[in-house]
């Protein structure tokens, strides 16, 4: 009976804290997307961080573009409830999603797809960190105590994590952006986190191993989940239209590049001549050429 009473009390405290927070102002860059779930990005199109409250503690999806963002999220956590960060799940290993791990771990356990640790260690460079710290006194202060925190757990292909009342399903996204991309699906909440496979009005950075056909397969998989809420790696959360628009873009890009290859155009000619309608206001235009290169690889196999 005592155990039952304690459990009920804990659950009541959790929901009371969650309800109370709905009236609080976490800051101008936080958006509530579901009960107990908040998305943060300091600047539009920078990496998102998501706070997921559970009865057993906080789950974070990524840790922020910079440690300054991570500390803002930590301040929000203190307003939300006196809960510890239980898990940090990374959608990718790049620094704009992982550099703030040291702010939350310990106690947070970091989870990512296999290959993330190797990628993070390879990219970790003291000179790069010093350059980032030199941006401003505030940024230098935010980096105090910095150390590289790599995943404690690496999964392969698929993993299911049950935390309190919430279930999180992790799926590997192959060749979509980094060496270790993860889509995260919350079936009860009908939310999907797309990693940087999908962004909003923003050209992706397509490294030489990125495959647009594989990216389209990942988008198809995520659409098949029938999500109500889509949280991209970069950009505002929204509906399944986010997936539809990115799918449309990649299909159009592949089709146009394929037609130009068939007409005898070289890669350089395609990059100079091809314009995709509807992308005029997209950010990251310097990345458009590598989008064309990825489409060219997808069409020709070269």
Q: Where does each model-flagged region fall?
A:
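Bacterial N-terminal signal peptides that target proteins for export
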Residues: 1-12, 19-20
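Accessory terminal helices/loops
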Residues: 15-18, 24, 224-225, 237-302
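Metallo-beta-lactamase
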Residues: 25-27, 31-33, 57-59, 63-67, 118-252, ...
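Active-site metal-binding motif and surrounding structural segment of the metallo-beta-lactamase
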Residues: 30, 55-59, 67-112
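Conserved beta-strand hairpin/beta-sheet module of binuclear metal-dependent hydrolase folds
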Residues: 30-75, 182-196
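Divalent metal-coordination and catalytic microenvironments
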Residues: 36, 52, 62, 77, ...
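Solvent-exposed, acidic/flexible segments
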Residues: 45, 63-70, 94-97, 113, ...
